[in-house]
Amino acid sequence: MENSGKANKKDTHDGPPKEIKLPTSEALLDYQCQIKEDAVEQFMFQIKTLRKKNQKYHERNSRLKEEQIWHIRHLLKELSEEKAEGLPVVTREDVEEAMKEKWKFERDQEKNLRDMRMQISNAEKLFLEKLSEKEYWEEYKNVGSERHAKLITSLQNDINTVKENAEKMSEHYKITLEDTRKKIIKETLLQLDQKKEWATQNAVKLIDKGSYLEIWENDWLKKEVAIHRKEVEELKNAIHELEAENLVLIDQLSNCRLVDLKIPRRLYLTQAAGLEVPPEEMSLELPETHIEEKSELQPTEVESRDLMSSSDESTILHLSHENSIEDLQYVKIDKEENSGTEFGDTDMKYLLYEDEKDFKDYVNLGPLGVKLMSVESKKMPIHFQEKEIPVKLYKDVRSPESHITYKMMKSFL
């Protein structure tokens, strides 16, 4: 055992130095070689133990033979002595049985030795086989592994190239399939069109004269309908242009007539056209009305003329501001503040009512400034209006009857 341990230590010291890092294939080979070496060492150790046992058995057999001879001699002496003493004599059969037992024991020992020798021979054969395998793997590690690694890399490159070629071929086949499908579809459509034309030609050949004339007339009517539709569209466009020009001309004429009549713009917008005055003009002219209403505290003669002039202006403002409820509330607040202004407001509203009735007569009389010079003032009773009246006036101004129409414009001309 000590010799085997020393031999293993020498093998470990005498072996080549280990590398720091090895590839997987070489590491596997080293691992397998180590396993084989360990197995060989175990077998060698078993062989040595068996040899030692064999030597021990040989020594024991020799010792047993010597003991056997000694016992035989001793038995013979005892027999001789027993015979001499008159003891029972050992017969030959007893001796033979004893000898047979010893022979059987020796035979068993010999069989055991043979078995041990057979095991030793088998172990030696295995040891030789393992040594041959070890040499083979060492040669493969030194020479064949590099060659196989090169083969593996070349095969991997071949596989990659085959995959790339397969992908390119598949893409090419897809493109060719799409092109062929498109070509087939185009050819089928062309063939269908040709067959339709041939069918129509054959049908026309077989058609009677009456039906042929009907078909020809139908085509002619379709063409005429298309031409008629184009003409209708052109006429509609021309009509729209003429209507726009007419509206422009009517607007110009109305503006010219209004300038000739000298009617204020807000009066026309509120009474004739039924429109609303923008809030900017309202806010600009409201303070003027308050100033004029404050100037009513004067003598009676001047008061009458001022009232009429202020009545015309207030009619314009009242009609222009009737669309908003806030102006009505503002007028009511002024009534509560000044009792003298209530008389002027009632007269102004009465005159407004009269102007609405006789609007056409005022227009036919001529300029509005000359008409106002002939107005005389009169004292009238005060009529307090209810709160619902301005709402009714607001509704009346916005009614469809108050809007301007073609007949109204014709009356101005």
UniProtKB/Swiss-Prot annotation:
Keywords, ordered alphabetically: Coiled coil
Ranges of biased composition (kind: Basic and acidic residues): 8-21
InterPro entries named in the record: CCDC83
Highest taxon in the source lineage: Eukaryota
Coiled-coil region(s): 37-184, 216-256
Positions of the UniProt region annotated as Disordered: 1-21
PANTHER family documented for this protein: COILED-COIL DOMAIN-CONTAINING PROTEIN 83, HSD9
Annotated protein name in UniProt: Coiled-coil domain-containing protein 83
Gene coding for it: CCDC83
